[in-house]
């Protein structure tokens, strides 16, 4: 049997799309393996959001040159970087046989056939079409988590982001199809449903039938079964009252909400084209906390955006302290060619970015520990995920607020919801015992 290997870079949407690529290869009769050295086809599913992504991809392509020469392995590149680079990738790396944009993975079978039959030396598909990518049933893994893309593309055009240019305009998947997917996954044993999109809470804006994100969440929660619903990533500007109400009333929906901040400075937020101010963001947080007691909030934050002053940075620190995020994904701004921010004046020196990032991390770590410490003595519902990575004799699970909990128990509990009493709290991990 022929073997294929898929290497994934980037966001959770890429992970989900890699699962679909895996399904395509399985339908073609390939055995999908992690052993690259024995693969007849290797596909890199790529990212282009951060500057270091290109370096990683180029490095891996360099490594694959020997495999190509030895086995004649078919080399494919998919994802955002493939969409952005197109033909240029083949020029830089002639070992590449197939380049597939985000919306073109359904064409993999015909591209493979052409390469195998020597009908073509290179196949490049980067059409940024308006229609939805093919709906392929992706098998969910042994972790009981099923991911479902509910939107594709993005209409926001934040000045630092390349995504709208490589993933196209926003398109929503029909509500009935998503609910059907949830029903099928839950029947197969899924305990965690993750809804994916570049901006999930703008779901349905391209519809004329009134379907929106609040209605979608409500309909999903009507599906019978014991499971939890999470979603990434929402946009603060589109976090409407009806969405907050649905989350508050439905126990199946995770009470950990990701609320990308990017900056705490209204001036920088305007330059980023984020559509909200510092004050509006804090007002939204207050509303969420009042409607959803015990909610955990996380964020994305960029430091060193062009023109960011010390005062702007201190505004970010101020928001982090006032909100007290459970966790933040913090990055130094990196130039992405093709975005408006790349040509802005007053680019910040790397040394300043690093220093600000370090200060921000110190503040966030204190907030994370403070939020974790609230759990001591509490009994929480935990979805058991399996053995801990560091200690196989200890089980690991997550709460509705996405806190990692470690405890001793039988491996047979994997995939079940259990109650755990928290005895010890550290910054990123809670420790407890089954009750």
Swiss-Prot record:
Cofactor(s) needed by this chain: [4Fe-4S] cluster
Binding residues for [4Fe-4S] cluster 1: 11, 47, 80
Gene Ontology annotations of biological process type: tRNA methylthiolation
Domain of life: Bacteria
Record keywords, A-Z: 4Fe-4S, Cytoplasm, Iron, Iron-sulfur, Metal-binding, S-adenosyl-L-methionine, Transferase, tRNA processing
SMART domains assigned to the protein according to its UniProt record, in alphabetical order: Elp3
Gene3D superfamilies attached to this UniProt entry: Methylthiotransferase, N-terminal domain, tm_1862 like domain
Binding note for cofactor: Binds 2 [4Fe-4S] clusters. One cluster is coordinated with 3 cysteines and an exchangeable S-adenosyl-L-methionine.
InterPro entries according to UniProt: Elp3/MiaA/NifB-like_rSAM (IPR006638), Methylthiotransferase (IPR005839), Methylthiotransferase_CS (IPR020612), Methylthiotransferase_N (IPR013848), Methylthiotransferase_N_sf (IPR038135), MiaB_methiolase (IPR006463), rSAM (IPR007197), rSAM_horseshoe (IPR023404)
Occurrences of domain MTTase N-terminal (ranges): 2-117
Record localization: Cytoplasm
Protein family membership: Belongs to the methylthiotransferase family. MiaB subfamily.
Stated role: Catalyzes the methylthiolation of N6-(dimethylallyl)adenosine (i(6)A), leading to the formation of 2-methylthio-N6-(dimethylallyl)adenosine (ms(2)i(6)A) at position 37 in tRNAs that read codons beginning with uridine.
HAMAP family per the UniProt record, alphabetical: tRNA_metthiotr_MiaB (MF_01864)
NCBIfam families hit by this protein: miaB-methiolase, MiaB/RimO family radical SAM methylthiotransferase
Subunit structure as annotated in this protein's UniProt entry: Monomer.
UniProt name for this protein: tRNA-2-methylthio-N(6)-dimethylallyladenosine synthase
Lineage: Bacteria, Fusobacteriati, Fusobacteriota, Fusobacteriia, Fusobacteriales
